[in-house]
């Protein structure tokens, strides 16, 4: 269940970093550092370079986020 105060945006994975962390370029060309959500980790959903993903950003820190969905 999503929280009420998060900002959901779409982006494209441009770099894979250690510990399930990724650099994602948003549709407005900003680059955000993102981690995988717990449900995606639990269900072994893999993310590769170039994948389109949905992110959740908090209003407090717009340069870090959480990947919640990978588009097919």
From Swiss-Prot:
GO terms for cellular component: cytosol. PROSITE patterns: S1_IF1_TYPE. GO terms for molecular function: ribosome binding; rRNA binding; translation initiation factor activity. It is found in: Cytoplasm. The keyword Ribonucleoprotein does not apply. CDD domains: S1_IF1. InterPro entries: NA-bd_OB-fold, RNA-binding_domain_S1_IF1, S1_domain, TIF_IF1. It comes from the Bacteria. The keyword RNA-binding applies. Keywords: Cytoplasm, Initiation factor, Protein biosynthesis, RNA-binding, rRNA-binding. Residues 2-72 form the S1-like domain. Coiled coil: none annotated. SUPFAM superfamilies: Nucleic acid-binding proteins (SSF50249). Transmembrane segments: none annotated. Component of the 30S ribosomal translation pre-initiation complex which assembles on the 30S ribosome in the order IF-2 and IF-3, IF-1 and N-formylmethionyl-tRNA(fMet); mRNA recruitment can occur at any time during PIC assembly. Belongs to the IF-1 family. PANTHER family: TRANSLATION INITIATION FACTOR IF-1, CHLOROPLASTIC. One of the essential components for the initiation of protein synthesis. Stabilizes the binding of IF-2 and IF-3 on the 30S subunit to which N-formylmethionyl-tRNA(fMet) subsequently binds. Helps modulate mRNA selection, yielding the 30S pre-initiation complex (PIC). Upon addition of the 50S ribosomal subunit IF-1, IF-2 and IF-3 are released leaving the mature 70S translation initiation complex. This is Translation initiation factor IF-1. It comes from Helicobacter pylori (strain ATCC 700392 / 26695). The gene is infA.
